[in-house]
């Protein structure tokens, strides 16, 4: 039995776990804390993990920090929902506001690889108009990057991650073929397709970051997806293409160091106002790593928390906060669902949970609300499903037991919908302290009228689709949420944004933010592909800035 990856650091003494070999190790370069590395990266998920690999491959010295453990998927992951909660960020946080956000496994990860270790692998591009949503569609804020530019980085990300997808994707501008063929649909996916066709809207196989055929690469070999169904609880075969299986091995091979179980609590600045390194807790004590540049990539809650916790005499309101926007404009995505029972068995747990998708309402503008949404087939595992029943139907005891007997006959569709930016929705610091003595995040959230209108519309459409295929005992789950964004938005004006298009702080030129917190708008699709595309662009821009002597 493998040791607990949360008990003590695994990436030490010049080696890190080789996740492609049971009990294996891979060489890892180590850097002195007293020597200033080119980049200290806080977080190793879709943003930080990608950036660590691509900067190291350009020859920069990189140390990447993660508060979570360094898991070995072949040994540490179990077919046990409760045990796999170890992958989630469940540290103390304070939530408030009119509509407090549920935090944990649905939107936070605590492991090398970040939340990509337990994400659902849905790999979608933004609708082109969303990059100029204010100018083009009349809501939100414009991105400082055009869709044409992002399309190039999306294509790179899809190739590097080895996305499995349909031969042609029916929405948006034409794009190259996905590297791997689409996954075969399970019964839940086929029923989504049937429901969409019944109400006259399109559907397709979902582009997924999990292999549909064997993959062999310099980092290691991976088999195709075994349709085990535990995607959101850690993939035991390495078929999942996460930061842990794609970017971190590349980072190590290129000379980066990864420090697991290393909680960064403060970014330090010097007399000249530039950052000088990070204070981090590891092996029972606080340490300091000098760095020429610091990249904060802790996602939409931990990124602003770190910037605010790093306040000092020169920056009393926190780092990169000259605009006063650090922590503000927090956005979540709505995750409402429709559930029903089919007479024939569905066995929706077989395979990835979202094998089929419709993006119709992202591209149809005949709506009475701003933004858009997609919906996908679902396949929750038993514990997840019991949570749905207790939450949405208020079932307990014998009523819950009886409802669970229908598990293999259930069908569900779940949306990912865009919620609009609002400065009142924010991350700030609470009075409560965590296990490191640091103020925890306070997450304040309230739904707007547009958010509610979008959810109402989606529930009507999803209900119609499963009613049309004969589902009965239909019920709604209205208030669920998922992915986060905002809180350190990028922009073209330092008065209205935290970082520029390159993810570089306007206020402190050697401080960068590279994760979903830079999103000016959150879109109506899953964010992980966009985060990785942004990281690829940022790495490219850093290389060019360095060559021009402008770092």
Please tell me what each predicted stretch does.
Residues 39-64:
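N-terminal Rossmann-like FAD-binding beta1-loop-alpha1 element of flavoenzymes
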Residues 54-57, 61, 68-73, 77, ...:
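Glycine-rich loop(s) and the adjacent beta-strand/alpha-helix scaffold that form part
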Residues 257, 292-415, 548-551:
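Mid-to-C-terminal "cap/lid" subdomains and adjacent gly/pro-rich loops that border
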Residues 2-39, 57-58, 544-551:
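Extreme N-terminal leader/targeting segments of oxidoreductases
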Residues 205-212, 224-231, 238, 265-268, ...:
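A glycine-rich dinucleotide-binding beta-alpha-beta segment and adjacent secondary-structure elements
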Residues 73-77, 115, 120-122, 130-134, ...:
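Short, solvent-exposed loop/turn and secondary-structure capping segments
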Residues 13, 134-264, 483:
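Conserved redox-cofactor binding core of oxidoreductases
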Residues 83-171, 175, 347-350, 363-364, ...:
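Redox-cofactor-proximal catalytic regions of oxidoreductases
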